[in-house]
């Protein structure tokens, strides 16, 4: 019987390699993993963005406050907070507020010695409330306050709506009418007059001048003592007589004297007290404030709308869940800050093409 021999032959082409797996090109995508370090993958989805600085904006779906009184033209927030004539208007409610005046300029009404008190904080205190309104009535009758009767002083730098001399609506400058003599400390009680259970912010202060003016106005050229007390907080002051710092930036008419302005916060139903001598600025209209508004440092104007307000970048729309760059306070629907970019691998781990078998 003849044997049948079958020969298996390998037929080769000009190439000496064949591919034994799926062909794959080199991958440019590298991700860091917790267990394997840097790994090449076939595809990624970026999860981070690096914002660029832009205008601040209104927070989407939320009332945003820029200036305390948007319709009060040529008025700083400090003017509005003190109710300077021509700077009294509607203060809209807001869930978010922009702190845009880090150092409010001095009101042109009268030179204020800012560094003696916390008065610079007043606009920001008001900005931190959702609802703020100025009372329609005065908290006390200043003309008949203890130590009076008083006439109410005005300033040519504070023209009112009729272009006559005026003064801040939150305070009454109590100048003795006839009894221009020194006085022992006097006490006035400041009642709570807000009607909706709000915090009551009561503004008060005192005027001081050189010895000649103090004698002419008040009959006493000595330093005067003042104390305020409310909500468990007591503050003491002694007035300065002359030797005031130059405040040419104040604007308005030149003034030989200065005023010191402060405020106290009265909780619902609580009475405050002010102990004073000559030159007192007695409280008049008060701020009634309620709710909370988130505050972020920024700049005006507010342009358009944004998902997020960021202290460094302004208004941001959330295109990615994370961001890199400068880390700062942000409010709203904001991406989360991360130190380095994050990527989501949406492909497979890159495997180089398998080595091809050579012909033996």
From Swiss-Prot:
This is Hemagglutinin. GO terms for cellular component: host cell plasma membrane; membrane; viral envelope; virion membrane. It comes from the Viruses. Gene3D superfamilies: 3.90.209.20, Hemagglutinin Chain A, Domain 2. Homotrimer of disulfide-linked HA1-HA2. It is a single-pass type I membrane protein. Binds to sialic acid-containing receptors on the cell surface, bringing about the attachment of the virus particle to the cell. Plays a major role in the determination of host range restriction and virulence. Class I viral fusion protein. Responsible for penetration of the virus into the cell cytoplasm by mediating the fusion of the membrane of the endocytosed virus particle with the endosomal membrane. Low pH in endosomes induce an irreversible conformational change in HA2, releasing the fusion hydrophobic peptide. Several trimers are required to form a competent fusion pore. GO terms for biological process: fusion of virus membrane with host endosome membrane; fusion of virus membrane with host plasma membrane; symbiont entry into host cell; virion attachment to host cell. SUPFAM superfamilies: Viral protein domain (SSF49818). Belongs to the influenza viruses hemagglutinin family. In natural infection, inactive HA is matured into HA1 and HA2 outside the cell by one or more trypsin-like, arginine-specific endoprotease secreted by the bronchial epithelial cells. One identified protease that may be involved in this process is secreted in lungs by club cells. Palmitoylated. It is found in: Virion membrane; Host apical cell membrane. Residues 1-15 form the signal peptide. The keyword RNA-binding does not apply. It comes from Influenza B virus (strain B/Panama/45/1990). One of its GO terms (molecular function) is host cell surface receptor binding. Major glycoprotein, comprises over 80% of the envelope proteins present in virus particle. It holds the Pfam family Hemagglutinin. Glycans are attached at residues 40, 74, 160, 179, 210, 246, 317, 346. Keywords: Disulfide bond, Fusion of virus membrane with host endosomal membrane, Fusion of virus membrane with host membrane, Glycoprotein, Hemagglutinin, Host cell membrane, Host membrane, Host-virus interaction, Lipoprotein, Membrane, Palmitate, Signal, Transmembrane, Viral attachment to host cell, Viral envelope protein, Viral penetration into host cytoplasm, Virion, Virus entry into host cell. Its main location: virion.
């Amino acid at each position: 019987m003849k044997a049948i021999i079958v020969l298996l032959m390998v037929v080769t082409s000009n190439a000496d390699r064949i591919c034994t797996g799926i062909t794959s090109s080199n991958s440019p995508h590298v991700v860091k993993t917790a267990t394997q370090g840097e790994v090449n993958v076939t595809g990624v989805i970026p999860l981070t963005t690096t914002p660029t600085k832009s205008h601040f904006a209104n927070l989407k779906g939320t009332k945003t406050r820029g200036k305390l009184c948007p319709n009060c033209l040529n008025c700083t927030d400090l003017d509005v907070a003190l109710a300077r004539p021509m700077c009294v208007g509607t203060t809209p409610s807001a869930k978010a507020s922009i702190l845009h005046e880090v150092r409010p300029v001095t009101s042109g009404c009268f030179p204020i010695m800012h560094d003696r008190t916390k008065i610079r904080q007043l606009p920001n205190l008001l900005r931190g409330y959702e609802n703020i309104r100025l009372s329609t009535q005065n908290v006390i009758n200043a003309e008949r306050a203890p130590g009076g009767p008083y006439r109410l002083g005005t300033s040519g730098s504070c023209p009112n709506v009729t272009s006559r001399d005026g003064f801040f609506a939150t305070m009454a400058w109590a100048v003795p009418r006839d009894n221009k003599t020194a006085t022992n400390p006097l006490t006035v009680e400041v009642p709570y007059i807000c009607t909706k259970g709000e915090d009551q912010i009561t503004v008060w202060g005192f005027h001081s001048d050189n010895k000649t003016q103090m004698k002419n106005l008040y009959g006493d050229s000595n330093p005067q003592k003042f104390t305020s007390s409310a909500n468990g907080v007591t503050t003491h002051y002694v007035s300065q007589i002359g030797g005031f710092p130059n405040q040419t930036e104040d604007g308005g008419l030149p003034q030989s004297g200065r005023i010191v302005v402060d405020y106290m916060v009265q909780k619902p139903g609580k009475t405050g007290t002010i102990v004073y001598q000559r030159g007192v600025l007695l409280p008049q209209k008060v701020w009634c404030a309620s709710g909370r508004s988130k505050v972020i440092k920024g700049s005006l104007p507010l342009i358009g709308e944004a998902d997020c307000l960021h202290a460094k970048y302004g208004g941001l729309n959330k295109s990615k869940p994370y961001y890199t760059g400068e880390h700062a306070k942000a409010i709203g629907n904001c991406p989360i800050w991360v130190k380095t970019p994050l990527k989501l691998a949406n492909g497979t781990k890159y495997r180089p093409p398998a080595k091809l078998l050579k012909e033996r």
